[in-house]
From Swiss-Prot:
Protein name (database record): Type II methyltransferase M.NgoBV
Residue ranges occupied by any SAM-dependent MTase C5-type domain in the UniProt entry: 4-423
Organism: Neisseria gonorrhoeae
Keyword Endoplasmic reticulum appears in the UniProt entry: no
Keyword Ion transport attached: no
Length: 423
């Protein structure tokens, strides 16, 4: 039986390792992880639970290549970081100061047979000059660096929902071999439904917010609904729809629904000397051009007192940030944004989950037992293709953080199989 040694960098929950090991087992290839690197405490605890006989190394930037055992395959899910270009393109040296540099320096020193890298979809266009470019400078330098090291490199954006996972999660996968280019063309399968991985009959949560929500909407009508004030659409619920901050009249509700759209338009903003921003506060005079009501000021005052609106100065864009410009008159703006409520979205069991991010995981709910609850740890693992028996005994907040940053294990398995064919 063939024996393959591999290393796992930026290991996180070891999702890339899991997928690679599954591919090896499927192809009757013996494999051994000879080196793991991770620095996040919660991830280290999970690694300890899963691999009690192993001791992960710490910060990869501080580890000399001579201290890393020889290996055949490098696995890494590295962060997306821009490179610094000063004058002449230097290839490998252009990557210095980023974590990809450490991936490259290890590949250069150890010359393994191949590698698998995973990153966010945004890496494809990261740091490009304009929209006419297919890929940005960051990915260009990465590919040039890997090819200069002698690897035949393939890359592709793949979606987890096409590999048996009920989550719409696109990521870029790069894989390379010293012998030949791995084939990353796959036959996709129909997306499974979220209900296939959900548990049932579990305790639900109760809070003033949830009580108000369920008072206005039966659970079955909440499937796929988002809760945020600064966007519209049929799948969105606003705080005023459930009277979260106090009762609203029909006139007040009508104004709020119109205002949330008008505040995003560019009309007339140049006249007040400000660049357009997504969500501009509008003065009473501006509002009166699209909402004519004899009692407009009282309506605005009422909504401001209840907390649905805020009276604030417009903001100028300065150094990449929005800073309020007190030289301009105050206007009325919607108060609550996407992350203002304990619920961000109620998942639709008959659909796939949206892309799951660390910051959103705690605010995703499902309908169960006539009420609402958050995802369980087991459901979270299933949404990324981890086995049910995967040890994951850490606080909920840490679970959400690790899951939001992990990989879809079945996609890694599929990519790994293609790499193994080239060895």
């Amino acid at each position: 039986m063939q024996q393959i040694k591999f290393i796992d960098l930026f290991s996180g929950m070891s999702g890339i390792r899991k997928g690679f090991e599954q591919a090896c087992r499927k192809q009757s290839v013996a494999c051994e992880c000879v080196f793991t690197s991770e620095i996040k405490p919660a991830a280290l605890e999970v690694l300890k639970q899963n691999y009690p006989d192993e001791v992960p190394y710490g910060d990869i930037t501080k580890i000399e290549t001579g201290d890393i055992p020889d290996f055949d395959i490098l696995l890494a899910g590295f962060p997306c970081q821009a490179f610094s270009f000063a004058g002449k393109r230097l290839g490998f040296e252009d990557t210095r100061g980023t974590l990809f540099f450490d991936v490259a320096r290890i590949l250069k020193a150890k010359k393994p047979k191949g590698f698998i890298l995973e990153n966010v979809e945004g890496l494809v266009t990261h740091d490009r000059k304009d929209s006419t470019q297919k890929i940005g400078r960051t990915l260009t330098v990465i590919l040039e660096t890997l090819e200069a090291l002698g690897y035949y490199v393939s890359w592709k954006v793949l979606n987890a929902k096409e590999f048996g996972i009920p989550q719409n999660r696109k990521r870029i996968y790069l894989t390379g071999s010293l012998k030949s280019k791995p084939d990353l063309s796959f036959e996709t399968s129909p997306s499974p439904k979220l209900k296939n991985i959900l548990e049932s009959g579990l305790p639900t949560e109760s809070s003033p917010f949830i009580k108000k929500l369920l008072k206005k909407f039966p659970p079955s009508e909440l499937y796929g609904k988002s809760v945020k004030d600064k966007r519209g659409g049929k799948n969105n619920i606003h705080s005023w729809d459930i009277e979260l901050k106090g009762a609203v009249t029909e006139e007040e509700k009508q104004l709020l629904n119109i205002l949330l759209k008008e505040r995003r338009k560019k009309n007339g903003l140049q006249k007040i000397g400000i660049d357009w921003m997504d969500g501009m506060p509008l003065t009473k005079a501006q509002i009166s051009t699209f909402y004519k009501h004899p009692d407009l000021q009282n309506i605005l005052d009422s909504l401001t007192d209840k907390g649905y609106l805020v009276l604030e100065h417009p903001k100028q864009k300065i150094g990449g940030q929005r800073i309020k410009d007190e030289s301009l008159p105050k206007g009325y703006n919607i108060v609550s944004g996407k992350k203002s409520f304990e619920i961000n979205k109620i998942l639709d069991p008959n659909d796939v989950a949206p892309t799951l991010f660390a910051m959103d995981m705690e605010h995703l709910f499902v309908v169960d037992n006539g009420g609402l609850r958050t995802l369980t740890g087991k459901e979270g693992l299933r949404l990324f293709g981890y086995p049910d028996d995967y040890p994951f005994d850490i606080p909920k907040k840490d679970r959400c953080d690790l899951l939001g940053n992990t990989v879809a294990v079945p996609v890694i398995k599929a990519v790994s199989e293609r790499l193994l064919h080239t060895l």
